[in-house]
């Protein structure tokens, strides 16, 4: 009888622990595929960006919902920029500084398929002139299905990670096709 109660208590504890929300993990937000390396070779930003700041993320409360922290997003962004050959080799020599703000992480409260929408502002500032040469808000979404995980809390984390990864991928795709152009002290994007 005592053994059965101990087993039941252990199972209950495991069930409660598995129901706790976990934060988005940076390694699952890193863009590793789909980068147009040929376009990167011709990009004005090749090997020239350093991440200055990432703000707007939230820490996960284990008793509530999974969130994307600023630190996890920054780690994923740095690794993704490195994979895309956009990250400067030395921070102090980087001609461009990247400032990022997570403006919105829109999450559903419940559902079988959970879609998370992220909206992130990316600003690239030229180091020497302190001029903004790129400033865009980029939206992205990702849907995690019941097939990805039967647990809603885990599906939400997967949707967070996928949306953040898609957002970083959209930024990289956009920035490798843009060239900063200085003319008379004004900055224009071509």
Please provide the spans of the model-predicted regions:
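A generic structural signal for short, solvent-exposed coil/turn residues
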Residues: 9-12, 41-43, 90-92, 130
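Sec-dependent bacterial lipoprotein signal peptides
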Residues: 1-20
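Extracytoplasmic/secreted envelope proteins and their assembly/folding machinery
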Residues: 70, 74, 78-81, 165-168, ...
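Compositionally biased, intrinsically disordered linkers/stalks adjacent to structured regions
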Residues: 151-190
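Extracytoplasmic/periplasmic, Sec-exported soluble proteins
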Residues: 65, 69, 73, 114-116, ...
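A structural "domain/chain start" motif
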Residues: 20-75, 176-190
């Amino acid at each position: 009888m005592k053994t059965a109660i101990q087993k039941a208590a252990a199972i209950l504890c495991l069930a409660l622990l598995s129901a706790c929300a976990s934060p988005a993990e940076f390694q699952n937000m890193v863009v590793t595929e789909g980068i147009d390396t040929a376009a990167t070779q011709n990009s004005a930003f090749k090997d020239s960006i350093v991440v200055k700041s990432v703000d707007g993320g939230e820490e996960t409360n284990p008793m509530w919902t999974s969130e994307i922290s600023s630190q996890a997003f920054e780690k994923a962004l740095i690794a993704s920029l490195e994979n895309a050959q956009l990250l400067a080799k030395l921070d102090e020599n980087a001609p461009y500084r990247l400032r990022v703000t997570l403006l919105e992480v829109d999450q559903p409260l419940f559902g079988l398929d959970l879609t998370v929408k992220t909206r992130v502002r990316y600003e690239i500032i030229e180091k020497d002139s302190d001029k903004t040469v790129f400033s865009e808000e980029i939206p992205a979404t990702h849907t995690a299905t019941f097939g990805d995980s039967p647990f809603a809390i885990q599906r939400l984390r997967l949707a967070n990670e996928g949306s953040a990864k898609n957002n970083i991928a959209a930024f990289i795709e956009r920035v490798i096709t843009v060239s900063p152009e200085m003319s008379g002290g004004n900055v224009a994007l071509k």
